[in-house]
Structure formats: structure tokens, C-alpha cells
Curated annotation (Swiss-Prot):
Gene3D superfamilies: 3.40.1280.10, tRNA(m1g37)methyltransferase, domain 2
Keyword S-adenosyl-L-methionine: yes
Subunit structure: Homodimer.
UniProt signal peptide: none
Keyword vocabulary terms for this entry: Cytoplasm, Methyltransferase, S-adenosyl-L-methionine, Transferase, tRNA processing
Molecular function in Gene Ontology: tRNA (guanine(37)-N1)-methyltransferase activity
NCBIfam families: PRK00026.1, trmD
Subcellular location: Cytoplasm
Species the sequence originates in: Oleidesulfovibrio alaskensis (strain ATCC BAA-1058 / DSM 17464 / G20)
Protein name: tRNA (guanine-N(1)-)-methyltransferase
Keyword S-adenosyl-L-methionine: yes
Length: 425
């Protein structure tokens, strides 16, 4: 496989390309690396490759002319990658894609980036190594070369080495041990010394699953796992941030079609469905807020039926879910109850289909690591303005880029809780 690196600093690669497996692969001819310097394709005596950006602003921009000439000088470029923050995340899956080709060209950006018009002239694919900033694309290009090159047949020597590495099966790798058998009081697990290859394989699979769940749970969403794997994962002790998440279904004050503040009646579906959602995701609690006494009595009777009355034997699962429900008169009462239960005042986040919001789903997920969060869901046509003003934040609408955004509160609650917590959490 041949890599063509378009860079202003070809000397950057001298040491890493000469070391270890990459050095051996180049010596054997499995991997070839060529460099094209845009400075060699300039037309002025100063060999200029950058200029000030149109519209002003800090920094310089790589000029399109030298880069275009550099790309056209490559006889067989193959796919052309541009290392850039805006690009497709580089993953093991993408490395496998790239390894199927014979040629790969990688553009290493510098300064503020390249002239955007270059992407209209050439079939350039932006690729990102992550959400951080480097001085240039050379470090990222080296990572792409190594991850892709080691998938070339013969590169690893023992092909099974690549098959059992992290991400190769969609999971992180299991832990490794070598001599001595005991190191500073810590022993190598007995099963690895047993010689029983079947048990060892099962242990390694279990450890890979647990390591992934505890360190990179988001990977599990796309990993190939079976029912036995799920049983292992369910038994694994892990953080449960859902315990720090609470929700409240607000029936007053909410607004009607005329945008007037009103109180609305409770509905069976809202109570049951959001209760089941809260139980499924392991929430700390679900509050029904209404100041109307007869509505509170109605709620209390319904809850008694399913948690202590005839409903327990008829549908015990529903009773389990509804034990999370607490009736309160106001949002402030719910806040006080959470503070009493947890020792911390919760961060209160409103939900609304209007406006842009000021809090993202990932932000709420991060909050849960530190303190409880109370999500407010409005009935009728949404929470009243005075409720929104007293909140610590307003969640971004579920379909913030589309015009139609009229979900039932039950549907909205399920979607929001799933986005905040996710299956793996």
C-alpha cells in the first residue's frame, strides 16, 4: 500500500516511519510512503504557500494553487483525505475501509486551514482525529497511516494479533498479563494459568465486555453482542446516573392556546407511560404537580390501586413503575423533596418546543455526575413563562431544526430521557 503525504514538513515523519513495525513494513515493501511539499509547486521566488484570509481575521490560509499543483503531481492518489476538525471521525471501521485500497493521499493542513475552494475541485474527504486542536495535520496523518497500514496483510506478522485488539470486534480489548506471576502482591488471574483455552476465551470475552461498559459505554451501541453478552453486562456493577435524574409533569402553571396561564387535569396515560419510562431508565423519581385537591385525591387513589390494592396482583410490573410517582402541589415542593432525599438542591431544567433552549442533552448528562437534575415537562401548550424564568436552564427542543415540533408529553419525555441517559448507561 502506498501513502502520499502532502505536507509542508516532510521531515516530521522521519523518526516514526523508521521505527518498529512501520519501519519493517517499509523495508519489506509492504508499505510505501511518498511526500509532496506544496512549496515545491509554487511559482514565486519566496515559495509562498499561504496568504491572509478574505474578510479579515487572525492567521493565514493555505493557498489553493500550490496545493492543487501538488495533488495533480501524484500519479495515483487513490482516496484523498484532509485532516480537519470538521471531518468524519477516524475509527477502526474507516481504517479497514482505507486498507482495502492500494493508494491513499493525506493532506496535512497548517495555519487556519486550506482555501475552501479546493474541496470543490478535488474529491477531498475531511477526516478528524477528535475534538481537539493540533498545530497541523502531520500528527493526525501519522496516526491514520499506522492504523491503516497495520491492517495490510503481513504487516503484523501474526494476523490474529490484529483480530483481538481493541475496536476490532467493536469492544475494547481484555487486560493482558505476563511474568512474573506475582507483582507487588497482585497475582495473574488463575484462569489464565489454567491452560483451559475454552475458559480463557470466555474470560477474555467477559473482561472485554466489562472494560468497554466501564470505560467507553457508548461503543456498545454498535458492538456485535449476543444474549449471553447482555447477561454479563447486566450483572456488571457500573455507574447509574439515571438515579440522579428526576422528572416532573407540571399541570400548573401551564399555558393554553391563547398563551394564558391555566391549570389542566391529570390524564391516566401521562401518569402510567411516563412512570414506566422513568422505571425503565432507573430514574430517581417522577413527580406529578397539581395544586387542585380533587386531582391530588384522584392521583392518590390511582397510585394506591396499583401499588397496594387489587392492581398489584393484576399487573405487578405497573405497580413497580408507579411506586416512583409522587404527587406534589408545586414544582418547589418537588425540588424540596429531592433536596431532602439527596442532600443537594437539584439543577432544574425545563423542556420546551419553543425557542432554541440553552442546554444540550450532553450537558445534562454531565450534570448528573455531580448532582441531581430535575426535568420539567409541561402539559397543555407548555410551561408558563414564570416557570421557565425560575429554571436553571431550558433544554434544546427535540426537533430543533424542523418546523413541526408537536409531540405528546409522553413521547417527548421518553425521547429526552433516552437522549440524556442512553442504553449503555
Amino acid at each position: 500500500m502506498r501513502f502520499n503525504i502532502v505536507t509542508l514538513f516532510p521531515e516530521y515523519f522521519d523518526s516514526p516511519l523508521a521505527c518498529g513495525l512501520m519501519g519493517k513494513a517499509r523495508e519489506s515493501g509492504l508499505v510505501e510512503v511518498g511526500f509532496v511539499n506544496p512549496r515545491d509547486h509554487t511559482t514565486d521566488r519566496h515559495r509562498t504557500v499561504d496568504d491572509r484570509p478574505y474578510g479579515g481575521g487572525p492567521g493565514m490560509v493555505m493557498m489553493p494553487g500550490p496545493l492543487a499543483a501538488a495533488l495533480r503531481s501524484i500519479p495515483r492518489p487513490g482516496r484523498i483525505l484532509l485532516m480537519a476538525p470538521k471531518g468524519r471521525p477516524f475509527t477502526q471501521e474507516l481504517a479497514r475501509e482505507l486498507a482495502t485500497g492500494d493508494n491513499l493521499t493525506i493532506i496535512c493542513g497548517r495555519y487556519e486551514g486550506i482555501d475552501a475552494r479546493l474541496e470543490s475541485v478535488f474529491p477531498i474527504e475531511p477526516v478528524s482525529m477528535g475534538d481537539f486542536v493540533l498545530n497541523g495535520g502531520e500528527t493526525a496523518a501519522m496516526a491514520v497511516m499506522e492504523a491503516t497500514g497495520r491492517l495490510v496483510p503481513g504487516y503484523m506478522g501474526h494476523e490474529e494479533s490484529g483480530e483481538e485488539e481493541s475496536f476490532s470486534s467493536g469492544l475494547l480489548e481484555y487486560p493482558h498479563y505476563t511474568r512474573p506471576e506475582i507483582f507487588e502482591g497482585h497475582e495473574v488471574p488463575e484462569i489464565l494459568r489454567s491452560g483451559d483455552h475454552g475458559r480463557i476465551a470466555a474470560w477474555r470475552r467477559e473482561q472485554a465486555l466489562k472494560t468497554t461498559l466501564l470505560n467507553r459505554p457508548e461503543i456498545l451501541r454498535d458492538a456485535q453482542i449476543d444474549y449471553n453478552d447482555l447477561k454479563i453486562l447486566r450483572k456488571t456493577d457500573r455507574e447509574r446516573p439515571g438515579r440522579n435524574l428526576y422528572c416532573a409533569l407540571v399541570h400548573y402553571p401551564v399555558v393554553n392556546k391563547e398563551n394564558k396561564s391555566v391549570a389542566v387535569s391529570l390524564t391516566n396515560l401521562d401518569i402510567h407511560d411516563i412512570g414506566r419510562c422513568s422505571c425503565t431508565f432507573g430514574l430517581g423519581g417522577y413527580y406529578i404537580t397539581t395544586p387542585i385537591e380533587d386531582q391530588r385525591r384522584l392521583l392518590d387513589g390511582l397510585l394506591r390501586h396499583w401499588t397496594d390494592g387489587p392492581g398489584v396482583s393484576a399487573n405487578p410490573d405497573r405497580g413497580t413503575a408507579l411506586r416512583l410517582v409522587r404527587g406534589v402541589s408545586t414544582v418547589e415542593e418537588a425540588i424540596g423533596d429531592i433536596e431532602q432525599r439527596t442532600g443537594q438542591r437539584p439543577t432544574v431544567i425545563a423542556t420546551s418546543a419553543r425557542g432554541a433552549g440553552d442546554t444540550g442533552f450532553e450537558s445534562v448528562r454531565r450534570m448528573l455526575r455531580e448532582k441531581p437534575v430535575l426535568l420539567l415537562f409541561g402539559t397543555a401548550h407548555g410551561l408558563a413563562p414564570d416557570v421557565l424564568e425560575r429554571c436553571d436552564g431550558i433544554l434544546r427542543p427535540i426537533r430543533s431544526l424542523d418546523g413541526y415540533n408537536h409531540l405528546s408529553v409522553r413521547t417527548a419525555a421518553a425521547i429526552i430521557v433516552d437522549r440524556v441517559l442512553g442504553d449503555a448507561l
